[in-house]
């Protein structure tokens, strides 16, 4: 979705989900800063290059690394789930920016929501699929 904020700048919105993590992303024309939950993105992701590269991958695919400031509100899950959710949210926001961005992002797999989530525990079992030890006698 595309909206205008108080200073009349255009804001592009995208929502990403992964496992139990949800990330609401705002892209604002700027210098390429990343803010997650009010903190610097590198600090929030513990300066882990894997997470940082994961989050910035959609922008690098389109060559827009230093064109937009990214503001993220991420809740739930752990760092891996949140990083994947942020990547999906950024990719969806970039599709709002220009419909031509959709094809390269889809080719790289950045617009695909990973459906894997924790399976619920069933009664009579110790975990989702682990059964108590069987004793024949």
From Swiss-Prot:
Transmembrane segments: none
GO biological process: translation
Coiled coil residues, start to end: none
HAMAP family: Ribosomal_uS9_B
Gene Ontology cellular component annotations, sorted alphabetically: cytosolic small ribosomal subunit
Region (Disordered): 106-137
Keyword terms, alphabetized: Ribonucleoprotein, Ribosomal protein
Record bears the keyword Ribosomal protein: yes
Organism of derivation: Thermosynechococcus vestitus (strain NIES-2133 / IAM M-273 / BP-1)
Protein name as annotated: Small ribosomal subunit protein uS9
